[in-house]
């Protein structure tokens, strides 16, 4: 129970054949489940039958994201949707957002570095900080932004210095990608052909998703 698993074997009536089984026991309390169990439920497309939007699970962060160092910082990921835009983004997904400060109640967490402060005219702090790009440009759009490549992370095999690096290994092992469509050219022109797809593991919400 409570998101644990067990293994065993089952003998058929004839007694001549056996099958190995791994049983996953799913808790209706999201935080009581291992990430591997949550993935199994997601794979089966059954997330909404066990949990609800807003349910939370503890995520302890360790390591460095850009210029921000984190040491045993416990936050709470929360569900924001099940199979959102499945025909476009990918099926059998449970969509989470980072993060809240508590398992219930609490406040939203905003990750920032030592360059955060009042906006007195934009001056680039350079690469590796929590800015969309290292200079005042949107060339290349979301796809080429330093926020996507250097802060959020795009790879499960090369992720040093990104958010992917600081989440628990158990969570990293079950991350699923989604397909996002954004303007990946930039320059301010409202041109439909500029909208192309990217494969993302930890995307930012779009303006319309926030609203």
List each language-model region with its residue ranges.
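Structural motif
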Residues: 1-2, 14, 61, 70
